[in-house]
UniProtKB/Swiss-Prot annotation:
Bias (Basic and acidic residues): 32-63, 70-82, 141-157
Compositionally biased region (Gly residues): 94-109
Modified residues (Phosphothreonine): T459
EC number: 2.7.11.18
Chain segments carrying region Disordered: 1-168, 196-240
Segments of this protein annotated with the region Calmodulin-binding: 588-600
Species per Swiss-Prot/TrEMBL record: Rattus norvegicus (Rat)
Keywords on record: Acetylation, ATP-binding, Calmodulin-binding, Cytoplasm, Kinase, Nucleotide-binding, Phosphoprotein, Serine/threonine-protein kinase, Transferase
Residues carrying N-acetylalanine: A2
UniProt-recorded name of the protein: Myosin light chain kinase 2, skeletal/cardiac muscle
Length: 610
């Protein structure tokens, strides 16, 4: 051990083996016969004094003075008071050299050899000063022994730090590991290693052999730097040779995931363009039957979902299964009302598609007919997109329109025309996604291309010119309505809406519409081309549902979603449109009530016998 206690122990050993010096006449035995060689404690433990003696001989010029060579014929006065090797640097790894790196002849045992790769020039020169004492030294044996013990103690105290600077010392390696372990958490990464391979220990470069017998200051620095570089190289190489799987800690992983999620949301919103889920029940063929509604279903009339001139829609629950459904209650006022319901049931029995609402059951009572259908909780499409928390972009419109086209294509393949496509009849599957379904087949008709079909009903804003003129209709009639819906989703404006129904119908007949420059400024040319090929007076010039799905605007949604991160102005204008529509309905109701009140107060009804 390179400790102070070890140095003192070696010094004590030297005292026990030292013999009194010879007299002035030179009588004495040769050093190789009578006096055992002492271990070079100064060489092993470090320099004894840091002060440089200017009178010391130059070791480079005379590395091994003749007076220091140990020969059997050398008289006692010519050798120094304590036998020691001439130079510390003459000892190689194998103990070769003039002074001898191994134990001296007649020694008590092999002394401990401590490496000293970082000896400085001052230490080497001072070592020569301490060992090359002149032959004329007249100090007594006791004085030399005390001086030797003091030098050994001081060498032990100064030799230990020099030993710790060795790059191959376990103490310095442990110190380096502690330094790495004490680094702040911000500079290190907490890792869990799986399958770490063993790393070979760094090899000791060993003490360097100096040709001149001593190390200069520059040589000492270069040697120390080389040893430290070798140490760093070994530590650096071990990290490259280790094959491991780094797993960040839970906190770092969560933080990184949150950062990635925040960056993604800043770039674009993830759109769900998957098909909507099917109905919670398989498609079935429904027939109108009589029965007791209250025994099979629990009606919740307070939870109204909508209504119209045919009746109201509320939620209900099937008692036997607990399935939540939507119940459409239709009043039977005339025989024609029942015929319309039977036609609606016939149409819905043929529509088994994810984007089309499904029929579950139909029950007739004495005063009404109730259709039990799939419950869709998301609400109307327009009610959803006017929400302040919803960010509407052109890509959102693409996703909505594509699903509507899918539903229309299936209907047309089944020879069914909806004839009442409008925003109120497009429902969202939920309140957060982009999945929609088409509802309300009360005005739907079976279509035969070989037969003429005319209708005179619908919502004025979405009616096609052929319906207004009471001309023959076709599957292209629904495509006109799709063009109007798309126009409104992109701009928030109704292209044909007038101050009243008459003005609206006149705008439809003349196909008087245009792209508002300010509103459509951020809309792509592909979207405008899509709308222009639908809102055209000539039926044969309109795109079919299949052609719409093949249009460039409804394709490559993934690439367009990356480029489109704007919020369309239509979201703001649609809100104004809905407010105006509600105000108009309320105004009509109030006006009708006021007219009825005036007629009643004037006595006109009494004159008519009412």
């Amino acid at each position: 051990m390179a400790t102070e206690n070890g140095a003192v122990e070696l010094g004590t050993q030297s005292l026990s083996t030292d013999h009194p010096p010879t007299d002035a006449a030179g009588d004495g035995s040769p050093a190789s016969e009578k006096e055992p060689s002492l271990p070079d404690t100064e060489k092993d433990l470090g320099p004894t004094n840091t002060k440089k003696d200017p009178g010391a001989p130059d070791p480079k010029k005379n590395p091994d003075p003749p007076s220091l060579k140990k020969t059997p014929e050398a008289p006692g006065p010519e050798k120094k008071g304590d036998s020691a090797p001439a130079s510390a640097s003459n000892q190689g790894p194998s103990g070769e050299g003039d002074g001898g790196g191994g134990p001296a002849e007649g020694g008590t045992g092999p002394p401990a050899v401590l490496p000293q790769p970082t000896a400085t020039a001052d230490a080497s020169i001072q070592k020569l000063d301490a060992t090359q004492a002149p032959s004329g030294n007249q100090e007594s044996g006791e004085a030399k022994a005390g001086k030797k013990a003091a030098e050994c103690r001081e060498a032990g105290r100064r030799g230990s730090p020099a030993f710790l600077h060795s790059p191959s010392c376990p103490a310095i390696i442990s110190c380096s590991e502690k330094t790495l372990a004490m680094k702040p958490l911000s500079e290190t990464t907490e890792l869990i290693f799986a399958g770490v391979s063993e790393t070979p220990d760094p090899q000791d470069p060993g003490p360097a052999k100096d040709e001149g017998g001593t190390n200069t200051l520059a040589d000492g620095k270069e040697e120390a730097e080389a040893g430290q570089a070798e140490q760093a190289k070994v530590q650096g190489d071990t990290s490259q040779r280790i094959g491991f799987q780094a797993v960040p800690s839970e906190r770092a992983e969560v933080g990184q995931a949150l950062c990635l999620t925040a960056k993604e949301e800043d770039c674009f919103q993830i759109l769900d363009d998957c098909p909507p889920p099917p109905a919670p029940f398989p498609h079935r063929i429904v027939e109108l039957r009589t029965g007791n509604v209250s025994s099979e279903f629990s009606m919740n009339s307070k939870e109204a979902l909508g209504g119209g001139k045919f009746g109201a829609v509320c939620t209900c629950t099937e008692r036997s299964t607990g399935l939540k459904l939507a119940a459409k209650v239709i009043k039977k006022q005339t025989p024609k009302d029942k015929e319309m319901v039977l036609l609606e049931i016939e149409v819905m029995n043929q529509l088994n598609h994810r984007n089309l609402i499904q029929l579950y059951s139909a029950i007739e009572t004495s005063h009404e007919i109730i259709l039990f259908m799939e419950y869709i909780e998301g609400g109307e499409l327009f009610e959803r997109i006017v929400d302040e928390d919803y960010q509407l972009t052109e890509v959102d419109t693409m996703v909505f329109v594509r699903q509507i086209c899918d539903g229309i294509l299936f209907m047309h393949k089944m020879r069914v025309l909806h004839l009442d496509l409008k925003p109120e009849n497009i429902l969202c599957v939920n309140t957060t996604g982009h999945l929609v379904k088409i509802i309300d087949f009360g005005l739907a008709r079976r279509y035969n291309p070989n037969e003429k079909l005319k209708v005179n009903f619908g919502t004025p804003e979405f009616l096609s010119p052929e319906v207004v003129n009471y001309d023959q209709i076709s599957d292209k009639t629904d495509m006109w309505s799709l063009g109007v819906i798309t126009y409104m989703l992109l701009s928030g404006l109704s292209p044909f809406l007038g101050d009243d129904d008459t003005e609206t119908l006149n705008n439809v007949l003349s196909a008087n519409w245009y792209f508002d420059e300010e509103t459509f400024e951020a809309v792509s040319d592909e979207a405008k081309d899509f709308v222009s090929n639908l809102i055209t007076k000539d039926q044969s010039a309109r795109m079919s549902a299949e052609q719409c799905l093949a249009h460039p605007w409804l394709n490559n949604l993934a690439e367009k979603a990356k480029r489109c991160n704007r919020r369309l102005k239509s979201q703001i204008l649609l809100k104004k449109y809905l407010m105006k529509r509600r105000w108009k309905k309320n105004f009509i109701a109030v006006s009708a009530a006021n007219r009825f009140k005036k007629i009643s107060s004037s006595g006109a009804l009494m004159a008519l016998g009412v």
